[in-house]
Amino acid sequence: MLMHTVLFKPRPGLSDGDRHALEAALVSALSGIPAIRGFRLGRRVKHGAGYEASMREDLEFAAFVEFDDLDSLKIYLQHPAHQELGSRFMAATAAGFIYDYQMVDRSNLGGLLEGPRVKPSGGTGS
């Protein structure tokens, strides 16, 4: 399973209209791209842990998009609904990080740590 991980901070002064347009683009992508296996969106919780002060960026939101495999992720990245979402996302954010991770459950930890990495087979995107 692959997890497309997006950490971000909205642009200061982002209008309600721009927020709604971003949300509409997200809903369109989630409902229109069958390659998406799962999705979660969350807001950062600050609770006084020491590591909070060491973060260089205060990225308020995290989105996690789950895919079965690399081919599914590539389908998502190339889909017109993702292109629209990506365009709106880039215009709406002040800062962000986007990473893709190969995920395993606890019964497969050794396999991930010892096994080969998923190798990219062309193309990039968010």
What role is predicted for each listed range?
Residues 17-18, 51-53, 77-78:
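Short, solvent-exposed loop/turn segments at secondary-structure boundaries
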Residues 2-10:
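Active-site-flanking beta-strand signature of metal-NTP-handling nucleotidyl enzymes
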Residues 13-20, 72-75:
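Short, conserved charged micro-motifs
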Residues 38-41, 78:
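Hydrophobic/anchoring residues in structured secondary elements
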Residues 25, 32-34, 56-60, 66-99:
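An amphipathic, aromatic/His-enriched active-site/gating alpha helix that lines ligand/cofactor pockets
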Residues 11-13, 44, 68-70:
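Short coil/turn motifs at secondary-structure junctions
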Residues 16-31, 105:
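Generic detector of contiguous secondary-structure segments
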Residues 42-57, 87-126:
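Glycine-rich beta-strand-turn "strand-cap" elements at beta-sheet edges
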